[in-house]
Structure formats: structure tokens, C-alpha cells
């Protein structure tokens, strides 16, 4: 059984984790992704309950920053266009005075493997590539974009008695 009690922060990739990996593009080159609102709620709950949360993605779209800033993530903790995810993960840990083993990381593809191995708990959706499944500590029962992030953020917060909904803080 996985011990979630030492987790002090959460970090994740976007495409294939928070989304199903599908990207729509219009004629002007604007990219569109679909996110599960349950994942967004879990991110907001984590932020409201004092957990640092970070995004480390190869995607460059400013809509990612807008989406997750609105859920409470500090814009400085949103690493867009990441080509060296372990470096960005280490920066996130340093900025929050965390040891890598105190952070849960969600990833789905080869660029995520090094971070998954460094993190305290590496989680992947059930449709992640095989190499990631082999590196993961946990394989979710859910595919990317279908609340696989919520599933394990919630478990970690509940294990610590920190899955607490404050309606007043949530409305701010």
C-alpha cells in the first residue's frame, strides 16, 4: 500500500494527464484542449489547503497558464515549454523547500520518466505509454483527462486529513 502521508506538493504534466492528449487546432494555429472539471476542483482544493501545486509541460499555450492560475496555482509554478522536466521539477522543489520524495508527480510519456523516478510518488493514467507504466509507482484505473489526477490528489489529501472544503475560501 502506498503511503501518501509524506506528500507535501503535487506536480503534473498536461497533455495525456490532465487532458486525453487530443489537441484541436484552428486555422490560425490556436490550440484547444479539454480538461476534466473534477481534476480542476482537486487542484483548487490542494491550493486552498496549503499544498504547492506545479505544472510542468512541453505545451506552450498561455491558455494552460490561465486555466491553472484561475485554480489557484502560482503562475511561477507553471512551467510551459519545458524541455528539461527534471530541471523544472528540481526548481519547483527548491523554490518550495521540498525534497523530491515529498512531491507527487503525474506523467504519461517518455519525457516524464526521469521526474516520476525522482518524485516520492509517480502516478500515470492507465493509457500512459508502457515505459511510463514501468516507471510509475501507481497506475490509475482512469485514462488521462478523466480525473486520474483528482483520484490520487484526493487520496493523498484524505490520508493527511486535509481534504477539507471551505466554501468561503473557495468562492474567493
Identify the residue ranges that each predicted region occupies.
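Alpha-helical substrate-recognition element adjacent to the catalytic core
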Residues: 1-87
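Mg2+-dependent phosphoryl-transfer enzymes with acidic/Ser/Thr/Gly-rich catalytic loops
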Residues: 32-33, 71, 76-79, 86-172
Amino acid at each position: 500500500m502506498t503511503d501518501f502521508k509524506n506528500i507535501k506538493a503535487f506536480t503534473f504534466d498536461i497533455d495525456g494527464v490532465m487532458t486525453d492528449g487530443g489537441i484541436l487546432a484552428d486555422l490560425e494555429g490556436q490550440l484547444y484542449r479539454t480538461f476534466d472539471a473534477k481534476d480542476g476542483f482537486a487542484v483548487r482544493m490542494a491550493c486552498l489547503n496549503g499544498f504547492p501545486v506545479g505544472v510542468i509541460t512541453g505545451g506552450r499555450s498561455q491558455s494552460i497558464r490561465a486555466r491553472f492560475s484561475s485554480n489557484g496555482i502560482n503562475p511561477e509554478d507553471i512551467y510551459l515549454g519545458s524541455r528539461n522536466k527534471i530541471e523544472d521539477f528540481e526548481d519547483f522543489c527548491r523554490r518550495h523547500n521540498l525534497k523530491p520524495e515529498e512531491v507527487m508527480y503525474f506523467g504519461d510519456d517518455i519525457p516524464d520518466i526521469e521526474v516520476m523516478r525522482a518524485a516520492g510518488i509517480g502516478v500515470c493514467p492507465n493509457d500512459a505509454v508502457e515505459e511510463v507504466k514501468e516507471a510509475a509507482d501507481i497506475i490509475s484505473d482512469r485514462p488521462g483527462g478523466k480525473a486520474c489526477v483528482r483520484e490520487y490528489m484526493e487520496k493523498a489529501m484524505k490520508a493527511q486529513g486535509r481534504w477539507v472544503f471551505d466554501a468561503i475560501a473557495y468562492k474567493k
